[in-house]
């Protein structure tokens, strides 16, 4: 944004300039009331349509507590408490309400999709990326959640994967659809494959969902998506899979489906373009070849998706789908008018040339020389980069015009991150920062319109991470840093701004300053947990520090393992600061439900900024945030200039106003999975079970299956831990014996509960082995209440004496066991002080108050006034 535009903005009451374009999305005030260390912070949206004279009143439980607020859209109520009802009232009589949270986050439970088998694995589901859209047109956002199984695969890796599942919720967790969308086995699950478009595409005020589908994909009503296609598509064999023995999808029908956001129903399905072998407009199943750069079903399975306004903001938007970026790069622009999906154009970036086709396959434009070939990134960005009133598509090292032409390319190739924003506020248009994966590696900042290089450097290896953010106030414009080194540099001229760098992940507005902070999930691969935090720049001490830790606020978990991104970061509620959505950490993914956590800032601010979702570049960023390696959204204008803030004298906020920590309590019932012991014949103690006490368990694991010895005594015993009842279990497995000459199946013959001698197993279960094969078999047994133990008995007669050793080694299953439990009223976690004179002396007492130093395993004792199990 130029200084002349800033002056014009100042003279017109600080309205946004023409470069900060607006979208036509119905937005209400979306008030939120967050508990802080100082009371309750109430905030609400400022909108670009607000008159300058508009003021706000705030009511608590019907009583007016603040009047005629005009210069901010947040108010701290020192006397507020969780559960209070707040009403925000405008001077025009508009009202909206919110109930105060009991912390700086709220949570809701969602039902986990059932595990799904694929090949020799079974995927258990965890929340992954989220998108947001108003699916019913009421001015409130709904959440669209993509579930990924724990056997999801990178496109570059072999292995079976279970299907992608998609579900929809209101902000309070209410599920919207009759069924989840299930993309089926012919869509491989992973970060590179399924990119969701959630946006109002036909102008009816309600968001649709678009994504790639295939034979076997089903919609939110349970119907096959092929039923919404033409006659040829309707004839698809939805029972057929094209998954190879290595878990790759080698061929088959490829579709694009648009779903009704409110019901999940497939409204229209067409053939996906291009096909996996580069077919421009296929009309039948295709088979892969090396068109996209390799022949192992990897580079053809790299996708991005976005939305762009190619006719200007007063016309309907267009969905953008990209396939391929390491070599041939195809970008497909698709319109939805409420009844039909149609091709606007298809851009093809080939080696030494590019061309653009219309929906009939006729060439609209073409040119030899530089192209978008090999210039893509694990992401995509949208914006009117040259202020001509039309969106351009930034794929990384190249920009595509609204007509599908190549606008520019740097020729610097592929990278893992992209940041499109007003990085250089004194320069016309928008700029791009990106790191580079391919030689000569390094990084660059370039003009998104011309491709001219502003800052660049080369390196000696893959530069896998990079971030651009306005992090240091005194440095005008954005700064950037990357994995190449530890230095923070200016996007404007490349000069060193700071000798250290913060996290290289997401930028965020949280503290109330008109400058960026950083967010990172800090994934720990050894514990499979996260330690999310926000970092800030302290202008007084000239240092980078952690402003806010999240681990003790609901035990949140970030997405995408080492990428450690939020499910979603966006300005969803309250004023202009951004919300963070994550899910609660779990030791496994076996419980029937999981918690979604929504965080909103507890920090007051003196700045009034229109809802970020009204800025076009930012709103488009929320659409594409889920694409590939999730990237943070950026504004299309320079916020300090809009607010008239001088960064050279600015002092950042350094004190968090977060409330006391809060751990979300576990459910009273749930599911827990058998874990692998640290050593052979080891004992594993879970929350509800103890296993391996008779030496059944080995330390060997494969694809989530544990080797469990059925032993020479032909039995396995699981003990029930104090404070729990086990009410059901599921065992999935197969015999470990792989004889090629005989059936070596193992039979489960009985299930016995506690001390009862009655077998509750309804029929013998065969776990196949040898010539019977090694495909997993699943059996669920429930309807009981085990208080002490569960005994499983087996028939190992198919395993001959010659094939077994002294430990019954070959009498073993590859098994996955999950237990359904409920907590009992054992009061183990309740305070118990009746017979204990000194409750907090750190010593161990029996239940009758006698001190002991020889506590026995499995018994209940008292320490520091609380019961525990040894």
Model-identified regions with their sequence ranges:
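Terminal processing/anchoring signals of secreted or surface-associated proteins
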Residues: 1, 20, 729, 826-831, ...
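Solvent-exposed loop/turn segments flanking beta-strands in beta-repeat/beta-sandwich domains
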Residues: 47-61
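Short, surface-exposed beta-strand/strand-loop-strand elements in extracellular ectodomains
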Residues: 598, 737-756
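Extracellular carbohydrate-recognition regions
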Residues: 658-691
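Residue-level detector of functionally pivotal "anchor" positions at catalytic/ligand-binding pockets or at interdomain
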Residues: 658-659, 822-848
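Terminal, low-complexity interaction segments
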Residues: 757-824
């Amino acid at each position: 944004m130029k200084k002349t535009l800033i002056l014009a903005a100042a003279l017109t009451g600080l309205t946004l300039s023409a470069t900060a374009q607006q979208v036509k999305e119905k937005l209400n005030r979306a008030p939120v009331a967050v508990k802080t260390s100082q009371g309750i912070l109430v905030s609400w949206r400022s909108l670009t349509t607000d008159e300058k004279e508009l003021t706000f009143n705030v009511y608590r439980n019907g009583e007016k507590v603040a009047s005629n607020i005009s210069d901010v859209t947040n108010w701290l109520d020192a006397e507020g408490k969780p559960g209070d009802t707040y009403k925000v009232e405008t001077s025009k009589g508009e009202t909206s309400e919110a109930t105060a949270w009991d912390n700086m986050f709220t949570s809701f439970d969602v039902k986990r999709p059932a595990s799904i088998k694929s090949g020799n694995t079974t995927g258990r589901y965890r929340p992954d990326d989220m998108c947001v859209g108003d699916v019913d047109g009421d001015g409130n956002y709904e959440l669209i959640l993509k579930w990924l199984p724990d056997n999801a695969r990178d496109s570059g890796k072999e292995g079976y994967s279970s299907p992608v599942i998609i579900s929809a919720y209101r902000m309070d967790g209410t599920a919207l659809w009759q069924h989840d969308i299930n993309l089926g086995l012919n869509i491989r699950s992973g970060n590179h494959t399924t990119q969701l478009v959630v946006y109002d595409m036909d102008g009816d005020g309600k968001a649709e969902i678009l994504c790639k589908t295939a034979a076997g994909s089903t919609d939110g009503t349970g119907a096959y998506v092929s039923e919404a296609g033409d006659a040829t598509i309707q004839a698809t064999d939805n029972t057929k899979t094209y998954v190879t023995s290595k878990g790759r999808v080698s061929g088959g029908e490829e579709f694009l489906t648009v779903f009704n956001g409110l019901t999940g129903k497939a409204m229209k399905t067409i053939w996906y373009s291009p096909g996996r072998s580069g077919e421009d407009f296929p009309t039948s199943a295709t088979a892969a070849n090396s068109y996209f750069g390799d022949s192992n079903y990897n580079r053809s399975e790299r996708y991005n998706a976005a939305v762009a306004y190619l006719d200007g903001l007063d016309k309907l938007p267009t969905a953008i789908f990209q396939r391929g970026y390491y070599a041939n790069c195809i970008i497909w622009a698709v319109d939805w008018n409420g009844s039909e999906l149609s091709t606007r154009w298809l851009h093809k970036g080939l080696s030494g040339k590019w061309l653009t086709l219309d929906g009939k396959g006729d060439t609209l434009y073409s040119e030899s020389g530089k192209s978008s070939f090999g210039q893509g990134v694990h992401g995509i960005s949208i914006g009117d980069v040259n202020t001509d009133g039309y969106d351009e598509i930034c794929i990384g090292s190249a920009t595509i015009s609204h007509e599908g032409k190549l606008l520019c390319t740097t020729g610097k190739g592929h990278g893992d991150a992209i940041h499109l924003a007003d990085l250089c506020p004194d320069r016309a248009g928008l700029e791009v920062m990106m790191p580079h994966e391919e030689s000569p590696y390094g990084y660059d900042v370039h003009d998104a319109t011309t491709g001219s290089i502003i800052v660049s450097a080369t390196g000696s290896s893959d530069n896998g991470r990079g971030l651009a953010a306005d992090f240091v106030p005194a440095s005008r414009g954005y700064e950037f840093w990357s994995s190449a080194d530890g230095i923070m540099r200016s996007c404007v001229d490349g000069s060193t701004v700071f000798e250290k760098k913060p996290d290289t992940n997401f930028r965020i507005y949280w503290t109330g300053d008109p400058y960026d902070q950083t967010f990172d999930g800090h994934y720990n691969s050894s514990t499979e947990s996260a330690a999310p935090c926000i970092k800030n720049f302290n202008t007084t001490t000239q240092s980078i520090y952690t402003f806010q830790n999240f681990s003790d606020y609901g035990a949140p978990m970030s997405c995408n393992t080492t990428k450690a991104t939020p499910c979603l970061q966006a300005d969803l509620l309250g004023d202009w600061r951004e919300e963070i959505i994550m899910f609660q950490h779990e030791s496994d993914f076996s419980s029937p439900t999981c918690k979604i956590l929504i965080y909103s800032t507890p920090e007051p601010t003196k700045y009034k900024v229109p809802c970020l979702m009204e800025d076009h570049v930012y709103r488009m960023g929320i659409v594409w945030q889920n694409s590939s390696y999730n990237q943070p959204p950026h504004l299309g204008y320079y916020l300090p200039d809009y607010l008239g803030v001088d960064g050279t004298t600015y002092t950042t906020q350094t004190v968090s106003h977060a409330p006391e920590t809060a751990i979300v309590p576990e459910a009273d019932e749930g599911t827990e999975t058998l874990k692998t012991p640290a050593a052979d014949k080891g004992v594993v103690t879970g929350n509800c079970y103890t296993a391996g006490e008779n030496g059944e368990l080995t330390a060997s694991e494969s694809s989530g299956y544990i080797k469990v010895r059925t032993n020479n005594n032909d039995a396995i015993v699981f003990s029930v831990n104090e404070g729990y009842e086990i009410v059901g279990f599921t065992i999935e497995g197969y015999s470990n014996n792989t004889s090629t000459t005989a059936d070596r199946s193992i039979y489960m013959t009985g299930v016995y509960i506690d001390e009862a001698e009655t077998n509750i197993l309804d029929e013998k279960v065969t776990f196949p082995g040898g010539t019977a094969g090694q495909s997993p078999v699943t059996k669920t047994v429930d309807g009981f209440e085990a208080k002490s133990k569960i005994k499983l008995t087996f028939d190992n007669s198919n395993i001959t004496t010659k094939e077994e050793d002294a430990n019954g080694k070959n009498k073993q299953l590859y098994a996955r066991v999950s237990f359904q439990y409920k907590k009992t009223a054992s009061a183990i976690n309740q305070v118990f002080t009746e017979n204990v004179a000194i409750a907090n002396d750190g010593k161990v007492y029996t239940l009758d108050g006698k001190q002991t130093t020889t506590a026995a395993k499995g018994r209940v004792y008292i320490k520091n006034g609380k019961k525990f199990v040894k």
